[in-house]
Every structure is written in structure tokens, then in C-alpha cells.
């Protein structure tokens, strides 16, 4: 990727993650909004599936389909559609309440206030500079 293209993507939302809105730091990722999905082939010698260097949707590898993302959001989103990623994030509170003792204790002590509302990504609310 060209340095100018990476800079363009970084500035798309004022240097913030398109999904959670955190400030992007060194190591930020370029996310394909609609997944490109790398192809895999079965390697008989290694006995496992490996990426073959090609992708299923090469036409999606373009600036219009790319968002700046923090590593955490991009790793969690992986190859999901936006709506699947939204569903995943929506379920985090349920899994924290079910699986995390520390979360449940912190909630009982009033350290955490849950806010149940639809997940809206930062890019959906971004108004741009000067607006």
C-alpha cells in the first residue's frame, strides 16, 4: 500500500478508529469494510489449511472499501460484515456478565454502569472537521 493511501485512510475519521472511535496509535490497521477473504488451500505436507496468496474478492481491495481501525476492532471484526460485527459487539455485555467474575464484582461495587443501547460505529456518527 502506498504511503499516501495509508495516510488518506488514517485521516478519514480524524485519526480515529472507524468502529470504536479511539485515537489510532502506531500499529493501527487498515480494515476492508466488505471482507476481501483470503483463499486457503489444504497443504498435505503440513496437514493443515494455509493461505495461498490470493483472495476471493480482489475488487474489494480499494480505498472506498477501507477504513482505519484500531488493532482490537480489526482483529475482532476479522472477515465479518458490518452487521455481524455489530451483533458480536452487542453480545459482549452478555458474555461479560456470564463469564467474567471481575466484571460482575466491579458492577456490584458500582464501578461499571451498563448502558444497553444499539451499537453505533464511530463512522456512522462522524461529522468531519468543521461541522
Predicted feature locations:
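Histidine-centered catalytic micro-motifs used for acid/base chemistry in nuclease
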Residues: 29-35, 68
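Extended charged
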Residues: 1-4, 12, 21-25, 42-67, ...
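Short cysteine-rich clusters marking metal-coordination/redox-active sites
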Residues: 17-20, 70
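Short regulatory "switch" loops immediately downstream of catalytic or recognition motifs
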Residues: 33-44
Amino acid at each position: 500500500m502506498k504511503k499516501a493511501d495509508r495516510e488518506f485512510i488514517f485521516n478519514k475519521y480524524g485519526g480515529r478508529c472507524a468502529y470504536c472511535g479511539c485515537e489510532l496509535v502506531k500499529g493501527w490497521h487498515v480494515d476492508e469494510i466488505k471482507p476481501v477473504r483470503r483463499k486457503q488451500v489444504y497443504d498435505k505436507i503440513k496437514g493443515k489449511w494455509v493461505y495461498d496468496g490470493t483472495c476471493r474478492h480482489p475488487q474489494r481491495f480499494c480505498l472506498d472499501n477501507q477504513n482505519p481501525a484500531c488493532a482490537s476492532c480489526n482483529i475482532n471484526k476479522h472477515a465479518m460484515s458490518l452487521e455481524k460485527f455489530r451483533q458480536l459487539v452487542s453480545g459482549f455485555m452478555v458474555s461479560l456478565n456470564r463469564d467474567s467474575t471481575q466484571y460482575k464484582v466491579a458492577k456490584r461495587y458500582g464501578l461499571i454502569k451498563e448502558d444497553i443501547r444499539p451499537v453505533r460505529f464511530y463512522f456512522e456518527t462522524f461529522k468531519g472537521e468543521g461541522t
